[in-house]
Amino acid sequence: PCTATPRVVDDLIVVSCGSSSGAAASVAFGLAPLAIGSDTGGSVRIPAAWNDLVGLKTTSGRISLQGVLPLCARFDTVGPLCRSVEDAALALAALEGSKPVDLTNATLEGRRFAICDTSAFDDIREAPLVAFNTAVDRLRRMGAVVERVKIPEAQAALALSGVLFASEAYGTWKDQIEANPDAMFSEILLRFRSGAQVSAADYVAAWLELDRLREAYYAETVSYDAVLMPSSPILPPNVVRLGQD
């Protein structure tokens, strides 16, 4: 990083995650009532989780990306980081120019949630897993029905990210990257450059497969109100160690 790395509000020796780290820190430290971030692979959700905030990753295409610096345009989204669900609902309405959802009489009674069994649970650390299970128990006590389901399409889609994310990101930024590669953090540079190795045929095939998986995933989950997953499998890393590793 070229400037200071934002820290987590209740532990100043660990990082706030990215890429919306400054957005999360500004709300967590009381500098702003809400913030807006971009999320392609977790950049709103994880900083929000690590700072005890609500982060909303909106559906791709729901909010205009005009004026947003792109990473992977077909996956990029914009969403708010707030202190409460109510604030997130108000921010979403403002972003899309709609009427806010009325949460006055909102209830979890009878709502159906699915926990998607994927490899996300294989390597999760104890503390995030305990927090996730505690949240699930709370939902059940409030009347929600929570079921574990196997959705292989989710895991299969994740495997495509190395092809689609890397090729889109490198295709967008290759001229700037190769003009001054030393300006980019080495590990991030390697991730971007991996997109140069993806053939056009593999890129198209990955998109066709993702479209198929999306349809199958929708069919598996359409009967549920939401799918529940941990926001992050790990706790925030130490800022010094992160810069050295």
Task: List each model region and its residues.
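Glycine/threonine-rich flexible loop motifs
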Residues: 125-126, 237-244
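Short connector loops at secondary-structure junctions
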Residues: 145-161, 192-193
